[in-house]
C-alpha cells in the first residue's frame, strides 16, 4: 500500500510555491499560452531533457544553467512557438525572456529556467511575451496550478496535474506536478513538458539522481507515436519549506521521497499516454522474468510502441501474435518457450504455446476500455513473462486510431 495520499492543489500544493497561466497572444487561437511557477525561496533544481540532436533554445539554456547552479526560483513556459531550430536569434530570445522575468521578479536571471512548446522553427513572439510577463506576475497565486497547467498545453485534450502528501519525520511533505503532451511522445530523456514542485529539503545530487530514476520509470517508459521532441523537458524544484530535516544521503527517508516522486511522474506520464492524439484508451504493458529492470522496460516499451499492437487494440482485436512479434524484436534475448502473454484476465499464450480463449469476450474487454472512466477503467493491460529472471518493468502507450493521422495531417509541427 502506498505510503502517501492524493491531495488537491497540483504544483501549488507544496508549501512556498505560486503559479499562474494567462493568455499573452502567443497562440493564434487566443487560448492561454504563458505559464509561470515561482518558489518563494531559492530551491534545489534538477532537470532531464530531450536526447534529440536538434534541441530547442530553452533546452540548451536550462542545461547550461543547471550545470552552473543547481538551484532556481522560477520556471517560465510559453506555448505556441517551440523556439527550436531558430538559430542564434532563438538563443537570444530565450536569454531575453529570462532577463525580462528576472527584472520583474527582482531576482538574478541565473535563477530562471525556461521551457517552450509549439511549432518547430518558429521563434517566440517576443512582443507578446514582453507585454505578457507583468500580467503573468500579477496573476501569481498559491492556487494557480490549474491556470498554469492550462497555459502549457497545445494539442492536449485535457490538462494533467497531481499532488501527493506523505510524512517525513513528523511533518507533512508534498510533491505536485503538471505536464503537457499528446503527440511526439517517445521521450528519451513528446512535445513532453513536466514540472514538479516539492517542499522537502534534499541535497542537489540526491534530487538529480531521484529525478533521473523517476524519469526512466515514467516519462521514458511512455510512447504515443515514436517521435521524440526537440523540447522534451522535466524540471523539478525542492525548496525545503516543509521544514523537515535535510535529506543528504540514501536511506529510508530518501527512498520514501523518491517513491512518491516516481508516483507523481508515473501519474503524469500515464495521463500523457492516455491523451495521445486520437487515442481511445491507455495501454499498460507489464513485463516480468527479464534479466534486469532495463531489459524488462525495453521489451515493454517496444510492445507499447508497436503500431501493429496499437492498431489491433483500436480495432478491438485480441491479436496476441503482434504482441509476441514486438517482444521478439525488442533486442532483449529470451527463450521463446518461456514466453507467456496475457490480455487483461485472458491467458493467450503460455510456455510458448497458444491457448484456447474466448475471442469475443477478449474483444469485449478491449471495447470496454474505450468507454471506461478516465485513467481507471480505460486501461488495456498486457502482461508478458519472458523467463524466470528478477527484472520487471512497465511501459505505457495508447491505441492508434484514424484520428491520429487526421490531427497530424492538419497540424503544422
From Swiss-Prot:
Q: Which UniProt keywords apply?
A: Acyltransferase, Amino-acid biosynthesis, Arginine biosynthesis, Autocatalytic cleavage, Cytoplasm, Multifunctional enzyme, Transferase
A GO cellular component entry from the record: cytoplasm
Which molecular function GO terms apply here? glutamate N-acetyltransferase activity; L-glutamate N-acetyltransferase activity
Q: Name one GO biological process term.
A: ornithine biosynthetic process
Catalytic residue list? 191 (nucleophile)
UniProt-annotated location(s): Cytoplasm
Q: InterPro entries from the xrefs? A: Arg_biosynth_ArgJ (IPR002813), ArgJ-like_dom_sf (IPR016117), ArgJ_beta_C (IPR042195)
Q: What is its EC number?
A: 2.3.1.35, 2.3.1.1
> Hey, where's the site called Cleavage on this chain?
190-191
Q: Where along the chain is substrate bound? A: 154, 180, 191, 277, 408, 413
| Site feature (Involved in the stabilization of negative charge on the oxyanion by the formation of the oxyanion hole) residues | 117-118
Q: Which reaction does it catalyse?
A: N(2)-acetyl-L-ornithine + L-glutamate = N-acetyl-L-glutamate + L-ornithine; L-glutamate + acetyl-CoA = N-acetyl-L-glutamate + CoA + H(+)
Q: Which family does it belong to?
A: Belongs to the ArgJ family.
HAMAP family found in the cross-reference section: ArgJ
Quaternary structure (record): Heterotetramer of two alpha and two beta chains.
Its annotated function is as follows: Catalyzes two activities which are involved in the cyclic version of arginine biosynthesis: the synthesis of N-acetylglutamate from glutamate and acetyl-CoA as the acetyl donor, and of ornithine by transacetylation between N(2)-acetylornithine and glutamate.
Q: Would you tell me the protein name for this molecule? A: Arginine biosynthesis bifunctional protein ArgJ 1
Which organism does this record belong to? Answer: Nostoc sp. (strain PCC 7120 / SAG 25.82 / UTEX 2576)
Amino acid at each position: 500500500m502506498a505510503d502517501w495520499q492524493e491531495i488537491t492543489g497540483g504544483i501549488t500544493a507544496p508549501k512556498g510555491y505560486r503559479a499562474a497561466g494567462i493568455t499573452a497572444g502567443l497562440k493564434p487561437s487566443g487560448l492561454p499560452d504563458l505559464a509561470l511557477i515561482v518558489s518563494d525561496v531559492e530551491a534545489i533544481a534538477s532537470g532531464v531533457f530531450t536526447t534529440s540532436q536538434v534541441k530547442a533554445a530553452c533546452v540548451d539554456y536550462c542545461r547550461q544553467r543547471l550545470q552552473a547552479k543547481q538551484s532556481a526560483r522560477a520556471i517560465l513556459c510559453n506555448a505556441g512557438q517551440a523556439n527550436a531550430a531558430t538559430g542564434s536569434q532563438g538563443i537570444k530570445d530565450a536569454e531575453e525572456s529570462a532577463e525580462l522575468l528576472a527584472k520583474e521578479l527582482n531576482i538574478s536571471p541565473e535563477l530562471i529556467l525556461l521551457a517552450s512548446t509549439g511549432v518547430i522553427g518558429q521563434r517566440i513572439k517576443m512582443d507578446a511575451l514582453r507585454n505578457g510577463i507583468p500580467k503573468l506576475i500579477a496573476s501569481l497565486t498559491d492556487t494557480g496550478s490549474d491556470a498554469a497547467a492550462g497555459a502549457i498545453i497545445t494539442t492536449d485534450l485535457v490538462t494533467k496535474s497531481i499532488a501527493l502528501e506523505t510524512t517525513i519525520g513528523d511533518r507533512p511533505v508534498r510533491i505536485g506536478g503538471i505536464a503537457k503532451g499528446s503527440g511526439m511522445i517517445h521521450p528519451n530523456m513528446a512535445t513532453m513538458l513536466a514540472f514538479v514542485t516539492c517542499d522537502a529539503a534534499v541535497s542537489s545530487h540526491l534530487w538529480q539522481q531521484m529525478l533521473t530514476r523517476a524519469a526512466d520509470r515514467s516519462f521514458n517508459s511512455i510512447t504515443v507515436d515514436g517521435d521524440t521532441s526537440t523540447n522534451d523537458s522535466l524540471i523539478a524544484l525542492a525548496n525545503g519549506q516543509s521544514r523537515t530535516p535535510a535529506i543528504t544521503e540514501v536511506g529510508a527517508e530518501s527512498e520514501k521521497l523518491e517513491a512518491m516522486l516516481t508516483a507523481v511522474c508515473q501519474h503524469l506520464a500515464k495521463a500523457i499516454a492516455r491523451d495521445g492524439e486520437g487515442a481511445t484508451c491507455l495501454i499498460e504493458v507489464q513485463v516480468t522474468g527479464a534479466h534486469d529492470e532495463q531489459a524488462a522496460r525495453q521489451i515493454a516499451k517496444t510492445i507499447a510502441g508497436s503500431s501493429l499492437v496499437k492498431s489491433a487494440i483500436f480495432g478491438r482485436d485480441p491479436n496476441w501474435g503482434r504482441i509476441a512479434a514486438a517482444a521478439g524484436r525488442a533486442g532483449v534475448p529470451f527463450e521463446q518457450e518461456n514466453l507467456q502473454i496475457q490480455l487483461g484476465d485472458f491467458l493467450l499464450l503460455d510456455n510458448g504455446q497458444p491457448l484456447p480463449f474466448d475471442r469475443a469476450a477478449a474483444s469485449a474487454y478491449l471495447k470496454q476500455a474505450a468507454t471506461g472512466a478516465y485513467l481507471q477503467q480505460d486501461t488495456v493491460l498486457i502482461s508478458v513473462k519472458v523467463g524466470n529472471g528478477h527484472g520487471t518493468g512497465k511501459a505505457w502507450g495508447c491505441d492508434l486510431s484514424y484520428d491520429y493521422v487526421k490531427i497530424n495531417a492538419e497540424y503544422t509541427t
